[in-house]
Structure formats: structure tokens, C-alpha cells
Swiss-Prot record:
EC number: 3.5.4.2
Annotated GO biological process: adenine catabolic process
Protein name (record): Adenine deaminase
Similarity comment: family membership: Belongs to the metallo-dependent hydrolases superfamily. Adenine deaminase family.
Gene name of the record: adeC
Catalytic activity, as annotated: adenine + H2O + H(+) = hypoxanthine + NH4(+)
Organism per entry: Bacillus subtilis (strain 168)
CDD domains linked to this entry: AdeC
Keyword Secreted tagged: no
Highest classification ranks of the organism: Bacteria, Bacillati, Bacillota, Bacilli, Bacillales
Cofactor(s) listed in the protein's UniProt record: Mn(2+)
Origin superkingdom: Bacteria
Length: 577
């Protein structure tokens, strides 16, 4: 802001000149006092300059609707939507999300700095306020086969970008606990730059929470219970309640919220597919859930706006008051969170559930390196997935938990044969993680229980966080065909049965993002999910999203990597038997 702009706003606030926009006949939510205000809202240069009686060059009649602050998603990986930031904005703005804090560590794990630069450039071509946290753990663990490695020196220049708020979720807790040199430098660089540091404390003890707070880690979005939430609040953290496409923790954590500690809680989605964003929305859905669960509506809206702004130092976001950006929602039904109009900095960007602005997507095209990310040394065949076993020893199996990121380690008797073959009656399927960044010919094999497929295979290049190819299936031929299909289409999601493609969703940008519109991707995903019934899937959870987290070796208990089974609690690889 320059001097001229400030003078212009002061003149409008002092009523020496008309405001650019005045909103009349609205019921304004005061998230500070938790009460309603019945006054005009005066806006100049996209900023609220007054509440009271004002004249404006343009008048908007709210017609008695409630006006609330724009929602803030406190932690989201935009890449998990499978669309670019420009298309992501079109999906969430109609639901009232006006600000997001994003961690581009998905694309950074594939393409490093080029991936971050692409996301930053895309963000500049949308009215959605997109703030960035720099990926702290690329790869998530030192033994991972990611497409890039980001050291402290690689991240430091990005702190000069105005959109960057700090260091993203620190998930390599071993490096923090052991004060590993480069991790300490990352933490220091963020602190010296006056930035925030996000946490990732999945399943960690209170001793480790102490260590994280000592490292200036401010928040955690991996909380799954009231007890975990209170442990973090006691140690000065903010707690994000998460509701994504797989991890659905809001209702389990909500009982921890009370009138005394509510300002330390806010909402996030973390990972949410575009079909879910379009159908139910983002933070608006969590506000609705919280109200339905009995939370005071004023508190629910505060958790959806002000609290995240305070956590991240966004001092012009999260409330309707002079000096704040005019990020406003017109709401016709408070409890159902029915958003009829969304404004960002005084501009109407969505109305009647649709985005109403023009973007400039063509000026933010991806670098060619992002379009060539699936690099297998050669096409795979069924022999590449053979899995010898000892029939006298039990097999270590990954047991999935529907709609959760955590898994369990179970043991089952080995079959008499000397080689493992999937057993659909026992729901024991084969899982494979195939390195796809450098053509290393490295494949980890294991057994997984809980998908319930009766035939065929599925595979995807979305495989947190290193995003190698991950596949699960009932036979080696279809697993090989699924992996090869992903190389053919440049990454994405696919279903194979009897060697034939049932449906695929291409994601050519880093194997993570589509170059199509949100609506087009949504339609393709609907077709994909419809086809799952042809391989025996009976529903209840999203198998692709569940599969995509089975290679993340920082969330308990047991995961798969390109080098085999990994026990998260002992933080070491274990054998199949």
C-alpha cells in the first residue's frame, strides 16, 4: 500500500468522499464479541473502511442476509485436488473459502523448486488469497526415492516471496529430535525470517511435542482425538481440525473445544479431491458439521475464519472490521452455511454457487519438466511382481482403516505355495510401490488387507509424499498393466481388469495435476468411481485416496516404500515375513 492509497481510504472512512462500495441491509457477524451488528459496511480499495452509516459510489443491498468473514483453510495441499491452483480457486470460492494456506510439498517432491515456482505463479492469477508454507521435508524421510531433495539453502530464497508465510509441516520428527544439521537450519531460517513453522505430529508422545515446541513449531493438523488436542493446547500449540477426503477427524477432536480454549482451534482440509470440493465444499462443510454437533454458531464461524488468520499473522483477514480486507460472504442460512455470494477484497468472485470472474490460465503454463515426470526404465511385466515366501512363516500385512490415514500391522499364515498369490476370499491383495522419477528399477512389494477387490488392479502416481507409482491388485498381470498405463498417460489414476483399461484419469502435470477444468476432472473421477464396482469394490471409502497414503512412512503404523515394508513406530524397514 502506498501513501495515496492510504489517504484515499482515510478520506472514505472519514466520510470526506464516498466509499467505493457500501453494503446495506445486512446482518453483520462480529466474531470478536460474538454478536450481530446492523450497520452499513463501507469498502474502498478492497478494504473495509467503516461500519456505520455511509454513502457509496456503488450500493449493494444484502436484503437481510447475514454477512460473515470469508473462510480460511489453514492447511491444504492444493495438488491433492488434482487440479491447478487456478481451477482449485473456482471450486472453493463459491463455497466461501477466500483464503488458503497451502504447502506445495506434493509437487515439490516430484519437481523440486520448479514445482514450487509453478504453484506460486498459478496463485498470482486467481482472486483466491493463496499463501504458501515452504516444504520442510522433501523427501518425507531420508531413505525415500523422491524426484527432488530440498535442503535449507534451496528453500531460503523463497522467503523473499510475499506469499510465503513460513515453513510447512515438519514431519521428519527423527531429524528434529536428533537436531539434524539441515533440519535445524530450516527451522532457524524460518525463525530468523520472522515466519511461522507448521507441525506434523501424528501419533507423537508428549515428550516429542515438547521437542517440537522447543523448535518453535506452532500447530498440528494430525490430531485425531480430544486427548491429543488438549496435549497440544497445553503446550501452546494451535490445533487444526481436519476434514479431507480420507482423514476425517473433525468430530473426534471437536469435544476438546470450549469457551476458554476455542481461539486455539481452526479448520483445515489437508487433502481433498476436487469431486468432494465441488459437492460439499471445504471449510464451509466443517463449520456446518460443528454447528450440527452442537457448537455455538459464532464459535464455529470464528474457527472457520479469525483463528487461522491469527495463527498465521494474517492481520487483515478473518473478521469484518475497519482495516480488514473485504473478504465477505453473504449467507442465507447460518446453520447450513448456505453461501449466496463471495467477495474477495470487495470484488464479487462467486454468486449462486458459481465463480463469476475471468482468469488468465494461459499465462501460468507448466514448465516442460513438469510434463515429463513418469520415467520407468522399461515397461513392466508380471515377473516384476513375483513375491517369493516361506510357507512356514507368517506374513506381515498392512491392514487399512477406512477413512483414516493410519494403518495397522497384522500377521496372517503364509499359503503353502512358495510364492504369494492374492487371495480375494481372505481379502489379501498385493501392493507394489514402483520408483518413477529416475528409472531406478526399484519396486517394493507387500500384502494389504481391506480393499475388498475381487478382480483387476488400480494404480496411481499420487503416492504421498514421494509420489512414486503405487498399485494394488488381485493378480500380477493387471498390476503390471496398470503401472504401464500410467507411464503411457504421463501419470494419473487407472483401473485395469483382465489386462484392459476400464477408465483412467490423466494427470500430466507432475503426475499430480490435470490440465483440464475442475468440472472436467470431476466428471472423469465420477466415471472412475463408477467403474470400481466392476472389480468388486463395494464402497464405504475412496480406495484411490486410501492407496495414495499407504506409501507415507511418517504416519503410523505400517507403510510401503520402493524398498519394502516400513514400520513407522520403530522407523525402520521390516521384512515381509
Amino acid at each position: 500500500m502506498n501513501k495515496e492509497a492510504l489517504v484515499n481510504r482515510l478520506n472514505a472512512s472519514a466520510k470526506r468522499q464516498k466509499a467505493d462500495i457500501v453494503i446495506k441491509n445486512g446482518k453483520i457477524m462480529d466474531v470478536y464479541n460474538q454478536e450481530w451488528i446492523y450497520e452499513d459496511i463501507a469498502i474502498t480499495d478492497g478494504v473495509i473502511v467503516g461500519l456505520g452509516e455511509y454513502e457509496g459510489e456503488n450500493i449493494i443491498d444484502a436484503e437481510g442476509q447475514m454477512i460473515v468473514p470469508g473462510f480460511i483453510d489453514g492447511h491444504v495441499h492444493i495438488e491433492s485436488s488434482m487440479v491447478t491452483p487456478i481451477e482449485f480457486a473456482k471450486a472453493v470460492l463459491p463455497h466461501g473459502v477466500t483464503t488458503v494456506v497451502t504447502d506445495p510439498h506434493e509437487i515439490a517432491n516430484v519437481s523440486g523448486e520448479k514445482g514450487i515456482e509453478f504453484m506460486l505463479e498459478q496463485a498470482r492469477h486467481t482472486p483466491l488469497n493463496i499463501h504458501f508454507m515452504l516444504p520442510s521435508s522433501v523427501p518425507a524421510a531420508s531413505f525415500e526415492r523422491s524426484g527432488a531433495i530440498l535442503k535449507a539453502a534451496d528453500l531460503k530464497p523463497f522467503y523473499e516471496e510475499e506469499e510465503v508465510l513460513g515453513l510447512a509441516e515438519v514431519m521428519d520428527y527423527v531429524s528434529v529430535q536428533q537436531a539434524e544439521k539441515d533440519m535445524v537450519q530450516k527451522l532457524l531460517d524460518a525463525r530468523v525470517a520472522g515466519k511461522r513453522i507448521d507441525g506434523h505430529l501424528a501419533g507423537l508422545s508428549t515428550d516429542l511435542i515438547n521437542i517440537y515446541r522447543t523448535a518453535f513449531v506452532l500447530n498440528d493438523h494430525e490430531v485425531t482425538s480430544k486427548e491429543e488436542a488438549l496435549d497440544r493446547i497445553r503446550r501452546g500449540m494451535y490445533v487444526m481440525m481436519r476434514e479431507g477426503s480420507v482423514a476425517k477427524n473433525t468430530l473426534n477432536v471437536l469435544p476438546a473445544v470450549n469457551e476458554k480454549n476455542a481461539r486455539r482451534f481452526f479448520f483445515c482440509t489437508d487433502d481433498k479431491h476436487v469431486d468432494d470440493l465441488l459437492s460439499e465444499g471445504s471449510v464451509n462443510h466443517q463449520v456446518k458439521m460443528a454447528i450440527q454437533a452442537g457448537l455455538n454458531p459464532f464459535l464455529a464461524y470464528q474457527l472457520g475464519s479469525l483463528n487461522a488468520a491469527e495463527c498465521y499473522g494474517l492481520d487483515t483477514k478473518g473478521a469484518i472490521a475497519p482495516g480488514f480486507d473485504a473478504d465477505l460472504l453473504f449467507v442465507s442460512d447460518l446453520e447450513n452455511v448456505t453461501v449466496t455470494m463471495t467477495m474477495v477484497k470487495g470484488q464479487t468472485v462467486a454468486e449462486d454457487s458459481k465463480a463469476v470472474y475471468q482468469d488468465h490460465a494461459s499465462t501460468a503454463a507448466p514448465d516442460q519438466a513438469l510434463l515429463d515426470s513418469v520415467k520407468l526404465a522399461a515397461p513392466l511385466n508380471k515377473q516384476d511382481f513375483h513375491m517369493p515366501i516361506d510357507s512356514e512363516q507368517q506374513i506381515n500385512v498392512i491392514q487399512i482403516i477406512p477413512n483414516q490415514l493410519e494403518t495397522r500391522l497384522v500377521q496372517v499364515p503364509a499359503p503353502v505355495a512358495r510364492e504369494f498369490e492374492p487371495d480375494t476370499e481372505l481379502d489379501l491383495l498385493k501392493i507394489a510401490v514402483v520408483e518413477r522419477h529416475k528409472g531406478l528399477k526399484e519396486t517394493g512389494l507387500g500384502v494389504v488387507k481391506g480393499f475388498g477387490f475381487k478382480s483387476g488392479a488400480i494404480a496411481t502416481t499420487i503416492s504421498h509424499d514421494s509420489h512414486n507409482i503405487i498399485a494394488v491388485g488381485t493378480n500380477d498381470e493387471d498390476i503390471a498393466a496398470a503401472v504401464n498405463k500410467l507411464q503411457e498417460i504421463g501419470g494419473g489414476l487407472t483401473i485395469i481388469k483382465n489386462g484392459e483399461e476400464l477408465h483412467s484419469v490423466p494427470l500430466p502435470i507432475a503426475g499430480l495435476l490435470s490440465d483440464q477444468s475442475a468440472e472436467q476432472v470431476n466428471q472423469s473421477l465420477l466415471t472412475l468411481h463408477d467403474k470400481l464396482s466392476l472389480i468388486g469394490f463395494t464402497g464405504g471409502f475412496n480406495p484411490f485416496l486410501t492407496l495414495s497414503f499407504l506409501a507415507l512412512p511418517v504416519i503410523p503404523d505400517i507403510k510401503m516404500t520402493t524398498t519394502g515394508l516400513f514400520d513407522v513406530k520403530s522407523f525402520q524397514h521390516i521384512s515381509l515375513q
